[in-house]
Amino acid sequence: MVNNNYKYTILKTVIDRGMQLMQNDVSEDMFQIWLKYSQSVIEQIANGTTFHIGYLQVILSTMASTILPYQKLSMCLKYLIGILPLIK
């Protein structure tokens, strides 16, 4: 079992990388790479939990929309930032 401090640190790293990406002109390809990375991490630290299911819902809503990659990334980051304090 992975301890909560490790989960918190890993999730914070995902968020930080997403925030760094937002400082650039985010392309769809860049967003997709970050999304796969973030999804993989969430699966490892929260597989089958409410956090994981909630993130999958956010991902589905971004895929079903025609918003810009920057906005998609923002939606994902908003969710991850929201659950970060709950992980610790």
Task: Describe each model-derived feature in a short phrase.
Residues M1-K88:
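Charged interaction/catalytic cores of defense and host-pathogen modules
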